[in-house]
UniProtKB/Swiss-Prot annotation:
Gene that produces this protein: HHO
Example GO molecular function: DNA binding
Identification of the protein by name: Histone H1
Source organism: Tetrahymena pyriformis
Entry keywords, A to Z: Chromosome, DNA-binding, Nucleus, Phosphoprotein
Regions of compositional bias (Basic and acidic residues) in chain numbering: 9-18, 68-89, 118-157
Compartments (UniProt record): Nucleus; Chromosome
GO cellular component: chromosome; nucleus
UniProt feature, compositional bias: Low complexity: 32-41
Length: 165
């Protein structure tokens, strides 16, 4: 009885070690997958503001955001130069660089997320619709010049398609 329990205890301990090890490996994998993306985002320094500005596509909002984005770009450029030097120096400084990149990314996201995401979503929805409407109307006009009767059918198809989109 004592031998069977001791064996089962050792087996349980081995199983625990086996289960803990892949969890640690999974955590390392997730950190590896996220941190190089963030370091690569911070390294070009142009990608981080572009990702914030590209969905906007509004000139008025770019004017409002360029002030904050220029500040973030200047901060990102500072970290880029630091990170470029850190890559030459040692691997031990990379985690500090990653933390700095996270600190730079998150305040911009926090500042951008609350007021900007709602505005972004509104303009994301409206602007592609306008583009699609222009795309739909121009071929309809061409069809109208070619054939007036099928053009009416095409306009109905275009409106249905735009509603689906």
């Amino acid at each position: 009885g004592k031998q069977s329990t001791s064996k089962s205890v050792t087996r349980e301990k081995k199983d625990v070690k086996k289960t803990v090890a892949p969890k640690k490996a999974i955590k390392k994998v997730t950190k590896k997958s996220t941190t190089p993306v963030k370091t690569s985002k911070a390294a070009p320094a142009s990608t981080t503001p572009i990702k914030d500005t590209t969905p906007v596509k509004a000139d008025a909002k770019k004017i409002h955001r360029t002030k904050t984005m220029k500040e973030s770009v200047s901060d990102a450029k500072k970290t880029v130069h630091k990170s470029a030097g850190d890559k030459k120096l040692s691997r031990s400084q990379k985690p500090a660089k990653r933390e700095a990149a996270k600190k730079i990314v998150h305040p911009a996201k926090k500042a951008a997320a609350k007021p900007k995401t709602a505005k972004k979503e509104v303009k994301k929805d409206t602007k592609p619709v306008k583009k699609d409407a222009k795309k739909d109307t121009k071929p309809v006009k061409k069809d109208a010049k070619k054939d007036t009767k099928p053009a009416k059918k095409d306009t109905k198809k275009a409106t249905k398609g735009s509603k689906k989109n």
